[in-house]
Curated annotation (Swiss-Prot):
It catalyses: coproporphyrinogen III + O2 + 2 H(+) = protoporphyrinogen IX + 2 CO2 + 2 H2O. The gene is hemF. This is Oxygen-dependent coproporphyrinogen-III oxidase. Pathway: Porphyrin-containing compound metabolism; protoporphyrin-IX biosynthesis; protoporphyrinogen-IX from coproporphyrinogen-III (O2 route): step 1/1. GO terms for biological process: protoporphyrinogen IX biosynthetic process. Its EC number is 1.3.3.3. It comes from Francisella tularensis subsp. novicida (strain U112). The record marks H183 as: Important for dimerization. Residues 248-283 are annotated as: Important for dimerization. The active site is at H114 (proton donor). GO terms for cellular component: cytoplasm.
């Protein structure tokens, strides 16, 4: 099992380089991803041990902020967020390896994107370890274009169909349900794919699906960035982007499993919260004008079949 974990780690660290390099090619000022490598000390007082590399870009003309973060951590006991629905895992040691990214563009016409790919092994130090993969990618537009959402979902479906014809509809529905703000009765964006507890096939089959899915993120996102990054925008557009970013913050702090897991397990706070946007705003009881550009997004962030 250790060999398989290391193989996935090697894939993720190379993917991190591929993604940051591809994104930098679209940046028009001197902003670059900087590497912040870290290691948790192996001491008795540390609940979580391990290491990682958070790559951050800030202040770009295209990407106002972005993080592509790799981590490999282990602990003696899974936190409550990981065992709430799987009581048989309570008290087990674990290893978790993953890559998580969030890209916050400066231009309100370029959507925010998020992706995450991970493996968990519970009881890795036993004769019967339990493994599963999780991950996916989702898109959060502020001023949506239907063709962008169709391209995003078509890319997702193409990858899913290559491995299992049932995956896209199942993981698309899961994504719509997961990225939902209950207190707002809103979805976070137009969705994509979300899956967890993936071990329904052999390890190699699951590994191949997850790595193909991860490799398709750039195919899904880069064409959208290229198409929208030079659209002119006003302060009104920017203000609405900041307002909608507030929903992103609310979801990450209240509902996101990765954030909750990281904080409950004693993870590295700076890396866990690095996905937050550089700026966001809240307006009391604000509503967009009827039939305005700003009202349009509320029709797009409802679950729908993007692929006819």
């Amino acid at each position: 099992m250790q060999e398989k974990i290391s193989k996935f780690e090697d894939f993720l660290t190379q993917l991190q380089q591929n993604i940051t390099t591809a994104l930098e090619q679209h940046e028009t000022n001197a902003a670059k991803f900087i590497s912040d490598k870290w290691q948790k000390p192996d001491t008795p007082d540390q609940k979580l041990k391990g290491y990682g590399n958070s790559m951050i870009i800030e202040g770009g003309e295209i990407f106002e902020k972005g993080v592509v973060a790799f981590s490999r951590v282990h602990g003696s006991e899974l936190p409550p967020s990981a065992t709430a629905k799987r009581q048989e895992l309570a008290g087990k040691s674990f290893i978790a390896t993953g890559l998580s990214l969030v890209i916050h563009p400066r231009n309100p016409f370029v959507p925010t994107s998020h992706a995450n790919f991970r493996i968990f092994i519970a009881g890795a130090d036993t004769d019967t370890p339990i493994w599963w993969f999780g991950g996916g990618f989702d898109l959060t537009p502020y001023y949506p274009f239907e063709e962008d959402a169709i391209h995003w979902h078509q890319t997702a479906k193409n990858i899913c169909d290559k491995h299992d014809k049932t995956y896209y509809s199942k993981f698309k529905k899961w994504c719509d349900e997961y990225f939902y703000l209950k207190h707002r009765d809103e979805c976070r964006g137009v969705g994509g794919l979300f899956f967890d507890d993936l071990n329904d096939k052999s390890f190699d089959e699951c590994f191949n699906f997850v790595t193909d899915c991860a490799n398709s993120y750039l195919d899904a996102y880069i064409p959208i960035v290229a198409q929208r990054k030079n659209i002119e925008y006003s302060q009104k557009h920017k203000d609405f982007q900041l307002y909608r970013r507030g929903r992103y913050v609310e979801f990450n702090l209240v509902f996101d499993r990765g954030t909750i897991f990281g904080l409950q397990s004693g993870g590295r706070t700076e890396s866990i919260l690095s996905s937050m946007p550089p700026m966001a705003s809240w307006r009391y009881n604000w509503q967009p004008e009827q039939n305005s550009e700003e009202a349009k997004v509320y029709q797009y962030i409802k679950p729908r079949d993007w692929i006819k």
